């Protein structure tokens, strides 16, 4: 391996993009830069009440360019020449419509302010009805069950549901779209000038988990399936939309002359294939087979890799897909997750902050002090809970505030808070939130184990994992497993850099690169036996409430969700 080689990892999150420079020799994180998306920060093109969340492509382009240029300018000139590759991860499923040149439609003047011409963010749930239609058709018997390898339930968060929703809602976008592309596949194509649909290299991760693609039926389902879903879907889009997909260790191309000039990097820089953030995060964390990796942020994405022989063609039910090569080439990558984790705590903080906002409006001179109080709310609640962590009067909270991803995706579900009394105070209710997120984590673990997919180890990574030991300890107690906290906040970007190093030829395989570059374990939390026993009782109560509450959100004629 060439000494001094550097790989860059690009991590496109919900709020910002991060670029991380990594030493390929030892995995040292040399420098990082984070830039927030300006339009997203202003709340443009989104409507939370309608579950509509869109990203303008300029947010990605401008933030990415600013982040990379800022980081590269801090490098000595000689070091810039040592950058050998760029890897990309992103949220998903986050697709956008593109024209025949591969330009996202919102980059054209006539679509510049049209949310339907933008990237439909992973947590956009406007396509619930369309997801229901896909599931009904998969189970109709008219076709093979194309949901077999994605856990048996197609989600409103995924590729075809979102495309169908926009197709039905917006005739102009429907007629202008030559194809659709996931963000993680579009960025490497953009940087290598290969965005045209016939040039575009689709990633095994995005295609395998979100598009119903599988080798058992030769790729995508047939055109007849989508025509039966809605003839509008195949009226203008070419068919098949694509045929091949590629693992992320393979190069997409090299940096185009235009982007090399804009970023201050050589045209020899290799672009590796893209993948979803949590899949690359698992690689950055050094995950081995049968390690459940929980990437914890606003939501969670849980990743587990398994041997082909153990899976042996079985369909694992209730998860978000099993894809050969979606994480590590040659292994089956399995995805699960919780639709809300950090978002639940943020919601509770906003709820409690209403009087502060009202006071700041009436007394502007107090705004700095009130903002400081608001910023410290969650930490204060956590401290109060840790001082008196009583489980005897813990409220029931169901962690469905943004629907449920796993087990068995159902985005119609809503959060539930129950079992309150006049003695329930804010820290106790916050304790209920902590327990709920831990219970959701255990339900995912059990979903694997009940289908003979063992969970030998549990890793947690992300800001909450490192900064909220009380929440992580609750997870260890509820799951009754040691919980290893990964030593980096940047594992997703690190994983992207690992793939860049492999694609650039510095390693022959992802496992070899992991041995050199993956991060280590910061600490291990052990379950407390006394709390394990009490949480077991509370988990059973949680499951009873889940079983009782879920039927209340079943679709009915004329119902609103």
Curated annotation (Swiss-Prot):
Stated name of the protein: Ribulokinase
This protein's encoding gene: araB
Cysteine pairs bridged by disulfides in the record: none
Phylogenetic placement of the source organism: Bacteria, Pseudomonadati, Pseudomonadota, Gammaproteobacteria, Enterobacterales
EC number(s) reported in the record: 2.7.1.16
Superkingdom as given in the UniProt entry: Bacteria
Enzyme class: transferase
SUPFAM superfamilies in the record: Actin-like ATPase domain
InterPro entries xref list: ATPase_NBD (IPR043129), Carb_kinase_FGGY (IPR000577), FGGY_C (IPR018485), Ribulokinase (IPR005929)
Pathway per the UniProt entry: Carbohydrate degradation; L-arabinose degradation via L-ribulose; D-xylulose 5-phosphate from L-arabinose (bacterial route): step 2/3
Signal sequence residues: none
Family per similarity comment: Belongs to the ribulokinase family.
HAMAP family hit by this protein: Ribulokinase
GO biological process: L-arabinose catabolic process to xylulose 5-phosphate
Molecular function via GO: ATP binding; D-ribulokinase activity; ribulokinase activity
Record has Secreted as a keyword: no
Database matches in NCBIfam families: L-ribulokinase, PRK04123.1
Keywords: Arabinose catabolism, ATP-binding, Carbohydrate metabolism, Kinase, Nucleotide-binding, Transferase
Record field: catalytic activity: D-ribulose + ATP = D-ribulose 5-phosphate + ADP + H(+); L-ribulose + ATP = L-ribulose 5-phosphate + ADP + H(+)
A GO cellular-component term linked to this record: cytoplasm
